[in-house]
């Protein structure tokens, strides 16, 4: 098969087609048009087509860092494609890690790329700092991706982050992943209150659907 860039297991939400991705040929896929924004039947169609991972890597090479959200147990194949493209230091690869998960950043294939373990916050009460500590044992992930979590869980994670020199990444998508900090809509109104608070409290990588606004805010910090 061919590795392609698509979020869902079906093409229904994000394209003008229907059916399972695994049932379609590459030729079938490349006839489909992508829908705008988050997709859905009411979302306007664009002139954009589904692209392969190889095409995406070639387009991004030398320009941007790609966050590859791998949707199946195909990490070896994905990272092999990244290596063939010579982009091991231009992609982020992530997978979930719990308290009993071995330190993944030290293991193939994750040890060849920028790897972020996604900390599992079981029932919203996990000892995230302990999971992060375990993931940094004889390993050096580039960052810990934070799950939806309580604000009270953050300080201990910041301490682990500083001790092991591993950055913290958080989503400000939707209502945001740290309770009480706010999300993208709040940040576009008052970036210092949301993104600024995250940064001041120890987060240095933010995933957002408002990248232009975040870049503008970051520029104000750099100018200080």
Labelled PLM ranges:
Residues 1-6:
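Acidic helix-start/capping segments at beta-turn-to-alpha-helix junctions
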Residues 7-123, 149, 164:
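Metal-dependent phosphodiesterase/phospholipase catalytic core, i.e.
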Residues 43-45, 123-224:
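C-terminal active-site rim and adjoining tail of enzyme catalytic domains
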């Amino acid at each position: 098969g061919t590795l392609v860039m698509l979020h869902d297991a079906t093409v229904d939400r994000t394209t003008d087609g229907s059916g399972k991705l695994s049932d379609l040929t590459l030729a079938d896929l490349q006839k489909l048009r992508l829908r705008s924004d988050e997709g859905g039947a009411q979302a306007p169609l664009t002139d954009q087509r589904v692209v392969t991972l190889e095409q995406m890597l070639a387009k991004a090479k030398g320009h941007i860092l790609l966050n590859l959200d791998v949707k199946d147990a195909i990490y070896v194949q994905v990272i092999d494609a990244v290596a063939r493209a010579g982009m091991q230091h231009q992609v982020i690869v992530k997978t979930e890690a719990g308290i009993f998960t071995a330190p993944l950043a030290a293991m193939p294939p994750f040890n060849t790329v920028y790897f972020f373990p996604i900390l599992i916050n079981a029932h919203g009460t996990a000892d995230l700092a302990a999971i992060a500590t375990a993931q940094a044992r004889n390993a050096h992930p580039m960052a810990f991706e934070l799950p939806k979590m309580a604000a009270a869980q953050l300080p201990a994670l910041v301490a682990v982050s500083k001790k092991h020199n591993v950055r913290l990444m958080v989503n400000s998508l939707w209502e945001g992943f740290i309770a009480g900090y706010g999300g993208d809509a709040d940040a576009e109104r008052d970036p210092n209150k949301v993104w600024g608070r995250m940064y001041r409290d120890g987060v240095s990588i933010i995933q957002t659907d408002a990248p232009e606004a975040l870049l503008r805010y970051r520029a104000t910090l750099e100018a200080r």
